[in-house]
Amino acid sequence: MPRTKFIVDDPMTRNGVLVSSRAPLETILVRTNHVTGEIELDPKAVTDNPRVTFEVPIESLDTGIPLMNDVMRGDRWLDAAKQPAIRFTLGRVTSPAGTAALEEGKTLKVEGEGTLELRGVSRTVPVRAEVTLLGKNESTARRLPGEVLHVVARFELPLAAFAIDSHLAPQSLDKVAGTLQVEADLFASTDRPQVPEDMRQRLAAARKSLGQRLVGS
């Protein structure tokens, strides 16, 4: 299998990013299932200049609390009006140190660093990931077309590095962690899923409606 491009674009919005803040007085969990991007690598030499990018629209981030969502998206926090998306771009892989190959069905652990773009600020962050190649078969076809790559990536988001901590009110200091934990769980495929736009809209509306019912229950 030569150098291959995998597309992160699940029309069923089953990919996910979870951001957690665990402070002395409060735990906040922020989630989105709207993730798009690309992963390009050589399965026989994963560390040989892989290219990874993904982004999430800030408006899709959800705490489960409407008022908290409004605050989070405002100019004192993520400033969605001026910077509507958060982007991550892999810079380099530092581990494994030598050539490493992906074996179908086996998980490979990698470490590296990438650039996180947030609020108009770009910062380098260390990243750890688990990568699994899933060959094309009847089971994977029920999820996505083509070869499938499952990536679980984790990194930290220090608020001070993105000038967010300075906006926190004194009474918020025990409710928001200074460093947030981010986990992206993504399935990418060599073939782009073909779903009519009206179906995408119905799926998005159904997910939004379900989320609202769960919050109100």
Residue ranges and their predicted role:
Residues 1-217:
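Low-complexity, acidic/polar, glycine-enriched regions of mature
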